[in-house]
Amino acid sequence: MELTPREKDKLLIFTAALLAERRKARGLKLNYPEAVALITAAIMEGARDGRTVAELMHEGTTVLTREDVMDGIAEMIPEIQVEATFPDGTKLVTVHHPIV
């Protein structure tokens, strides 16, 4: 199987998000890479499902709360930008203050 660098990146994000999801389900607080991966994967999947950029900008703020992450992590992530593939092409989704 041959994958482009972009496809490899998507697979890596998905794998990290899956790990983060499992750790969160066990009650563990997420670290920086886990939090970013989980939010990023949610945005990418939402785009694939056909949601709009505006919907995903809002949805990105509902994936995690401060209680889900280690101390100081929310402040380390002022925004997340994701180039997501929508049915009509690739668009940049920016989520400001993703962890409230």
Curated annotation (Swiss-Prot):
Report if keyword Lipid biosynthesis is assigned.
no
Q: What is its EC number?
A: 3.5.1.5
Entry-linked InterPro entries: Urease_gamma, Urease_gamma/gamma-beta_su, Urease_gamma_sf, Urease_subunit
- Species per Swiss-Prot/TrEMBL record: Cupriavidus taiwanensis (strain DSM 17343 / BCRC 17206 / CCUG 44338 / CIP 107171 / LMG 19424 / R1) (Ralstonia taiwanensis (strain LMG 19424))
Gene3D superfamilies registered for this protein in UniProt: Urease, gamma-like subunit
The organism's superkingdom is given as Bacteria
* Subunit structure, interactors included: Heterotrimer of UreA (gamma), UreB (beta) and UreC (alpha) subunits. Three heterotrimers associate to form the active enzyme.
Question: According to its UniProt record, where is this protein mainly located?
Answer: cytoplasm
Q: Which UniProt keywords apply?
A: Cytoplasm, Hydrolase
Which Gene Ontology terms cover its molecular function?
A: nickel cation binding; urease activity
Its protein name is Urease subunit gamma
Record's NCBIfam families? PRK13241.1, urease_gam
